[in-house]
């Protein structure tokens, strides 16, 4: 053990800011703990292996322990030993034999090495026992950083919500097999920031890259024992530190992250982080002591009121952060502010967001944390997206978050999947979901963008697998099929998995286009899962959280069909962006506007007439039209905006349906801009109002009314502009599969090309 250094080595320093702050002359160390009796600062060598000094923090102010170390510099590796009672039955688990990470550390060095010494109790015995082994040599260390970075001309894109299209991806998986990324940069922040990668994302037309968790995290020992890893990263142990495994040069991971953000911003792309403030990697009472548990277990975690030895588990991970404690709320908001200001990210997706607003008696829409995000000068201008559920009582809260927040909408996912699968009785629900789910979100002045629509996400089937598998195939996860959802609302179109049957292949391709077009043409904010635009597969694995291999990695070896699908997605995105009526801020009501003599939306039966009330829930009704009247786009002085009138027709029947094109004020002809059934998916044919259009079974068609008025020049230009833009090719990766990709694909369990 290194010698204990007198307190006099440290001056009193400051309780704020929390964490380790270098000012060029020394480092201020500050750590919150309401229940500790003493805190020791432990300094380590440059490799983070040898403990050099142990110094007691000299001051305690407002429940914060602090001290200033002159001549300390950036690059200093450190940790803490926190003294206090070890009384699990009272909620206290202090153990100074365990080195703990600073919750505010901006960087980590090294990796957790699973050993009995990292547990506060004697592993294999009762958690009431006290373990005296030193954990330091098995622990990663916190590191002091110099945050200096030259941003240059970088500017935040500030994409308006109505133009936002989210693109969910994984830093490692997106470029691990990318042929244009140098091998040493693949799977890193630097790889994601490469020009070839950024150019592809930009040309696709999405606006905001949503990254799966990049906070420092831990892989559970049971996964390592199986030769697996925590690939997704939903197991955070540091909310300020980017995980060094995503860096080409781990010692400078924070700078590499900033460089990636700058490159994406230069292209006008936003960066959204998936953040996990609901639990930590320390698990339940049988978990390790890595940070929060050993610093102040009673403050950081929600414990059972009648027996604080045990943790409330509303997350399914073993513990739940205590968002009723002011200091925990402060830590989370400080973390968000750090990423928004110092790291310049543009928004956040909150995993299990209900947790963040839980109080003693359940979810509270007026919770201080939710309100503080909206009032904070740095956070109020970012995009705030909640995953509005957890597994606790009353945890499902879709539509329950306050104004200013957007929410993942799983009702959209399930309804759209069921409709295109051919489930009966989905017509009414489908109309609601196409209208931004006003039944959930149209309250308190919220706008339609509050509904984040998705068909697939990281958790579940990819789009290709959704139309190729009826059942999950998670054998590679080593849990005997117990993991992952069993009800996926999927349909394999006749054969489970890959097939050579041309009819089934054609149907699957059309179903993918139907699902993507529905997602991108619905009101609300669309989110695409990266790789869905060219048919990425996970071989039927719907829970690939532990698969850091070709099951999860994006395969950039394209064939003609993959390129064709990506071109289709780009064209539909251009349609959405070209016509504001496809991305309204206001919710659709269908009510008659006497001032404008119009309804903003009409729902049409194949006869071309309004759907009658009695027929909304007709179990045989699987074809209908959504008519969006451009005259309803009124300004504050009740003057119609210059916008298109659009007709979206969806047919989930297996057979052709004759659909009568309605007569509408403002034009006498309908131009077909999109048809998911024909080879290039765009037609540009013109049909007269009143004419009958044959819509193929299981297909979607979009029409725009040809404007007849001389005042509609802008609309004609928008239509022509879309036609011209649609001819530009998308820059795809080289089609040849490199040796590493071939090797990865052949080695990954269960991977077979369709």
What are these regions (language model features)?
Residues 1-163, 167, 172, 499, ...:
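Carbohydrate-interacting/catalytic domains
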């Amino acid at each position: 053990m290194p010698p204990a250094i007198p307190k006099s080595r440290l001056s009193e320093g400051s309780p704020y800011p929390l964490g380790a702050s270098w000012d060029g002359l020394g480092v201020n160390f500050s750590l919150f703990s309401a229940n500790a009796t003493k805190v020791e600062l432990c300094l380590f060598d440059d490799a983070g292996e040898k403990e050099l000094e142990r110094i007691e923090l000299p001051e305690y102010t407002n429940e914060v322990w602090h001290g200033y170390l002159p001549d300390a510099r950036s690059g200093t590796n450190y940790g803490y030993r926190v003294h206090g009672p070890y009384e699990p039955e009272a909620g206290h688990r202090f153990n100074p034999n365990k080195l703990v990470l600073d919750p505010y550390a901006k960087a980590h060095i090294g990796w957790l090495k699973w050993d009995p010494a990292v547990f506060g109790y004697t592993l294999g015995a009762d958690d009431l026992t006290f373990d005296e082994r030193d954990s330091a040599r098995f622990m990663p260390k916190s590191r002091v950083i110099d945050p200096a970075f030259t941003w240059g001309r970088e500017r935040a894109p500030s994409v308006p919500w109505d133009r936002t299209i989210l693109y969910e991806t994984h830093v490692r998986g997106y470029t691990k097999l990318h042929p244009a990324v140098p091998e040493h940069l693949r799977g890193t922040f630097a790889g994601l920031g490469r020009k070839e990668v950024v150019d592809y994302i930009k040309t696709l037309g999405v606006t905001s890259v949503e990254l799966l968790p990049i906070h420092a995290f831990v892989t559970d020992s049971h996964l390592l024992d199986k030769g697996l890893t925590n690939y997704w990263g939903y197991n955070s142990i540091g909310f300020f530190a980017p995980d060094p495994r995503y860096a080409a040069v781990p010692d400078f991971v924070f700078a590499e992250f900033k460089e990636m953000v700058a490159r994406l911003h230069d292209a006008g792309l936003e960066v959204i982080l998936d953040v996990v403030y609901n639990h930590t990697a320390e698990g339940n009472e049988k978990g390790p002591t890595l940070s929060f548990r050993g610093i102040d277990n009673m403050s950081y975690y929600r414990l059972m009121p009648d027996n604080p030895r045990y943790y409330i588990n509303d997350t399914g991970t073993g513990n739940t952060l205590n968002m009723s404690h002011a200091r925990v709320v402060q830590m989370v908001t400080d973390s968000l502010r750090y990423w928004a200001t110092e790291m310049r990210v543009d928004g956040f997706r909150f995993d299990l967001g209900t947790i963040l607003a839980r109080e003693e008696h359940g979810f509270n829409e007026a919770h201080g944390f939710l309100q503080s995000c909206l009032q904070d000068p740095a956070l109020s201008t970012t995009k705030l997206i909640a995953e509005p559920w957890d597994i606790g009582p009353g945890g499902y809260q879709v539509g329950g978050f306050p104004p200013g927040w957007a929410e993942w909408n799983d009702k959209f996912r399930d309804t759209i999947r069921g409709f295109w699968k051919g489930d009966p009785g989905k017509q009414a629900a489908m109309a609601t979901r196409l209208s931004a789910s006003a039944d959930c979100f149209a309250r308190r002045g919220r706008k339609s963008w509050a509904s984040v629509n998705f068909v697939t996400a990281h958790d579940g089937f990819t789009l290709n697998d959704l139309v190729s598998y009826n059942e999950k195939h998670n054998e590679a996860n080593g849990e005997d099929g117990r993991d992952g959802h069993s009800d996926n609302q999927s349909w394999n179109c006749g054969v489970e998995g890959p097939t050579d049957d041309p009819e089934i292949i054609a149907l699957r391709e059309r179903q993918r286009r139907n699902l993507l077009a529905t997602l991108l043409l619905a009101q609300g904010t669309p989110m695409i899962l990266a790789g869905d635009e060219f048919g990425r597969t996970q071989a039927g694995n719907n829970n690939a959280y532990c698969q850091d291999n070709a099951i999860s990695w994006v395969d950039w070896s394209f064939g003609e069909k993959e390129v064709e699908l990506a071109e289709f997605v780009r064209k539909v995105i251009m349609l959405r962006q070209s016509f504001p009526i496809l991305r309204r801020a206001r919710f659709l009501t269908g009510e008659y506007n006497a001032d404008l003599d119009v309804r903003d939306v009409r729902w049409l039966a194949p006869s071309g007439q309004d759907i009658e009330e009695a027929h909304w829930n007709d179990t045989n009704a699987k074809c209908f039209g959504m008519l969006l009247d451009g005259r309803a786009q009124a300004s504050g002085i009740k003057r119609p905006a210059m916008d298109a009138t659009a007709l979206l027709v969806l047919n989930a029947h297996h057979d052709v349906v004759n659909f009568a094109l309605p007569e509408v004020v403002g034009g006498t002809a309908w131009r077909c801009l999109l048809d998911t059934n024909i080879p290039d998916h765009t037609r540009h044919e013109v049909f007269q109002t009143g004419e009958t259009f044959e819509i193929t079974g299981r297909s979607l068609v979009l029409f725009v009314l040809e404007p007849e008025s001389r005042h509609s020049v802008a609309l004609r230009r928008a239509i022509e502009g879309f036609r011209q833009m649609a001819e530009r090719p998308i820059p795809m990766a080289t089609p040849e599969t490199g040796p590493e990709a071939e090797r990865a694909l052949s080695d990954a369990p269960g991977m077979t090309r369709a």
